Each structure stands twice: as structure tokens, then as C-alpha cells.
Amino acid sequence: MNEWMAAARNPTAEWLESCFGVGSLWRPAEAELPERLEHEGTREFLTTVGFPAVRIDGFLDFIDFDSSRLKTEGPWAEDPDELFGQRTPDDDSPPRSYAFEFGKCQEFSLMVDGVVGCVDLYDPNGWDHAAGYAGEAHSSLKALSGALGLAAQFAQRFEGPEPLKALAEFRTAIEDLDPLVESDLWEKVTEALEEEFEPAEEIGQDS
């Protein structure tokens, strides 16, 4: 557990590939990055470590995460004011900044703020009535990468005899990994898992 946390706090390409497979990372050259992705920490992480460009399934299908398009298309860019309902319909001024999609989780898009580097959730179902903002995910793309790696490490324990215990430890690990953010992303994921695990564990105890 301590080794997992140390690796998740400072994820390397080697560790992430041990979680998701050799060749699974999108590691663009500096010139390949979007110009409006201005946050230096994000740019450095992408060009030196890389971000998982994967479709997560199997043990991790509970996350329903897909970032596979990064390698072929790069991150989708959009005006965050437009996404999150902060722009009036008659405002045709140029975007002040951009946010970049680095994957989808369930029905939400994970949007990295191009200026400050934080990761927010965008709900496309709320776009047309100023309800696109669905909460915080992580303080940085680096932290999101570490959290995805942790999920990969915990996955087999969720299939074991004590999934609720594993889930509680996973929640604590996510909180310790990114203490500045109460992640709405993992709250949604873990609440759904808890609903699934509780009856399954009760059946196991009764048998």
C-alpha cells in the first residue's frame, strides 16, 4: 500500500505502463501540444511522463474510462465558460482560455483547465441549461494519472472476498493522494461500487 501511494504521488512512465500496459501512454512532443494548453506543470508532465491513452475495461470496467482518442486526435479543446454556463447566449467574444478533454468517465468529460491545470467534470447533459459543471475531479493531470494507477492496483481486491474493505481503503488513498480536492469523480464511482458490493458481500457472508 505504501509503495502504491509513493508511486501514485509521483507517477513515472514505467509505473503507469506497469498499470496499463507497455505503449499505453500519450507522450507528445512539446510542439505537438495545443498552444492554449498554457499550464507549465501539465505540459512538462505530458512531455516527460505522459498520460494513459486507454479504454479501461476488465477489472476496471467499474470506472468506464476512455482516453484512447488522445493518440489519434489529441485532446478536444473548448471554451470552459461555454461548457460550464458562464457565457450568455449573445456573448460572441473570443474565449478567455480553453479547457481540454483528457478522457471520459461514465457520462462525464474530464476537462483540464489550460491556465491553472486543474481537472473538472463536464456533464454534456447540462450544457444547454447552464448546468455543465459537475464538480472537481483532481488538482492536476498528474494527480489524475496517479489516481487511475491506484484504481488499477486496487481492481483485483474489489473482486476478492472483502470488497467493501478494499473500497474504504481506496477512498482513503484517493483522499491522501490529492488532499486539496474532494473529488466528485471518485465520489460518484465509489458510491456506485458501494451499492454493488453491499449485497454481494452479504450473500458471501450468508453462504
Where do the model's predicted regions map?
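Membrane topogenic helices and adjacent juxtamembrane segments
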Residues: 1-11, 119, 146-177, 193-207
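A surface-exposed partner-binding patch
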Residues: 1-109, 180, 186-207
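Compositionally biased amphipathic helical and low-complexity segments enriched in hydrophobic
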Residues: 71, 84, 142-145, 168
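Polyanion-engaging groove/track-forming segments
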Residues: 97-98, 110, 127-130, 134, ...
